[in-house]
């Protein structure tokens, strides 16, 4: 996509897709990590630059339309959740997501959670909208440098317990400098998964494997 305009699909993008991905991407697509948003759900003037540069409302149909510009003629569904941000009205964002999925039986949604949400809040939202999982994010940790947050700081055990009770998935975008190679991350992932076997933990972005060396170091843990 063109520098300075992440929302514009260029001929370079299309050529890259044809060269590298056309033979790999299946005829039917399920996007397992897709965000939706409304600008109105962010505090005034606080929407991140990527969101501010895009449409005022990016729901499921808009996401599909944009992807079809790059990947035409392939039916698409997905696992959707709101765009996490500290200024986000999470209740409004979750309601928007729930409404978006009412007429998309092939797609699923995850509830955007903050550490302050009670088990009852989660139960009620999941029951109301039929969400299949939870989406936590480090920006909701109660510290200034949230990239150093432990998993427990933005995914407390009480919420993992609810996911286990309801058989929900959790999408975890872990942080800390070495990601999967971080001992604290390893210990928490093992403890949560062994203690709550009905909870399915999705380690987002290939276990945040942006540095392959960290993934190699931590994958056997």
Each model region followed by its residue ranges:
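Mid-domain alpha/beta scaffold segments of enzyme catalytic cores
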Residues: 2-158, 162
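Catalytic pocket-lining loop regions of alpha/beta-barrel enzymes
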Residues: 8, 132-133, 148-221
């Amino acid at each position: 996509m063109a520098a300075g305009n992440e929302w514009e699909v260029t001929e370079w993008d299309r050529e890259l897709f044809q060269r590298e991905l056309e033979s790999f991407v299946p005829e039917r697509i399920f996007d397992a990590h897709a965000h939706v948003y409304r600008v109105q759900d962010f505090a005034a003037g606080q929407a991140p630059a990527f969101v501010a540069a895009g449409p005022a409302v990016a729901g499921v149909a808009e996401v599909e339309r944009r992807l079809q510009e790059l990947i035409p003629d392939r039916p698409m569904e997905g696992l959707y959740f709101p765009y996490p941000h500290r200024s986000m009205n999470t209740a409004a964002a979750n309601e928007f997501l729930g409404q978006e999925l009412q007429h998309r039986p092939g797609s699923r949604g995850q509830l955007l959670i903050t550490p302050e949400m009670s088990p009852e809040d989660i139960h009620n939202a999941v029951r109301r909208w039929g969400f299949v999982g939870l989406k936590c994010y480090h920006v909701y940790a109660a510290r200034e440098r949230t990239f150093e947050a432990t998993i427990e700081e933005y995914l407390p055990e009480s919420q993992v317990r609810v996911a286990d009770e309801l058989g929900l998935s959790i999408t975890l975008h872990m942080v800390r400098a070495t990601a999967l190679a971080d001992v604290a991350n390893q210990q928490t992932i093992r403890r949560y998964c062994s203690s709550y076997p009905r909870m399915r933990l999705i380690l987002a972005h290939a276990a945040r494997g942006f540095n392959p060396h960290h993934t190699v170091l931590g994958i056997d843990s």
